[in-house]
């Protein structure tokens, strides 16, 4: 099968299976299928059996499975979940960290939402904002188009991303097994800025976490080039 060949022929360390944790189930109206017509758990149950079979009989030791998005009914079957499709608008739709508040100690996520795809838009503020939010909510920083990121216009943004990824490496004892408690807005010198696609927010963002041993940790990110 495909999972076997990817591991044995190519030697991958992880396998990404698109859509499973993202796509909503479609109703089935076939009366001969043995489930309630137009309902039932066949979609969810079928995927769980499929992924369970892969994990039990095909996935090699120290390999991981990932999928798109973070449907609750599959989080125990995947080692990481890519979160990028959350809708957002400046005025009408604000992303709130409900999922990490509930599942941060039981699910590993990657990314936050789609990042800019053009070099001249990398420095408008939303790129840094998305990376900062990913870090604060415990998500692995990533899902970034390398072409605009490595352009001359994005040198400072690339440096900002490298700083956050290096910093996150020191937080493994917090974000893996720890619990996201809340977002914070630090008081004092903390100017409000307009983030394209997200609206107004503070330049310095923060979050409170609780480590597995019960200790509190505060993560603070300054998105500005200036000190605050």
Q: Model features per residue range: what roles?
A:
Residues 43-228:
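Active-site-proximal substrate-binding groove within the catalytic cores of carbohydrate-active enzymes
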């Amino acid at each position: 099968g495909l999972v076997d060949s990817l591991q044995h022929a190519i030697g991958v360390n992880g396998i990404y299976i698109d859509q499973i944790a993202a796509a909503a189930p479609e109703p089935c109206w076939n009366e001969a299928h043995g489930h309630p017509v137009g309902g039932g758990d066949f979609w969810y149950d079928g995927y769980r059996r499929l992924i369970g079979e892969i994990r039990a009989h095909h996935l090699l030791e120290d390999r991981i499975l990932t999928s798109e998005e973070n449907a609750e009914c599959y989080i125990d079957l995947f080692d990481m979940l890519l979160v990028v499709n959350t809708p957002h608008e400046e005025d009408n739709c604000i992303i709130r960290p409900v999922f990490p508040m509930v599942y941060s100690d039981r699910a590993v996520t990657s990314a936050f939402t789609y990042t800019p795809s053009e070099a001249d838009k990398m420095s408008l503020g939303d790129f840094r904002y998305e990376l900062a939010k990913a870090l604060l909510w415990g998500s692995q920083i990533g899902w970034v188009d390398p072409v605009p990121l490595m352009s001359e216009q994005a040198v400072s943004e690339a440096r900002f991303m490298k700083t956050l990824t290096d910093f996150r490496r020191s937080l493994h004892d917090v974000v893996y097994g720890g619990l996201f408690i809340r977002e914070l807005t630090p008081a004092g010198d903390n100017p409000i800025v307009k983030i394209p696609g997200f609206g107004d927010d503070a330049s310095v963002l923060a979050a409170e976490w609780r480590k597995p041993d019960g200790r509190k940790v505060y993560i603070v990110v300054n998105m500005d080039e200036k000190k605050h």
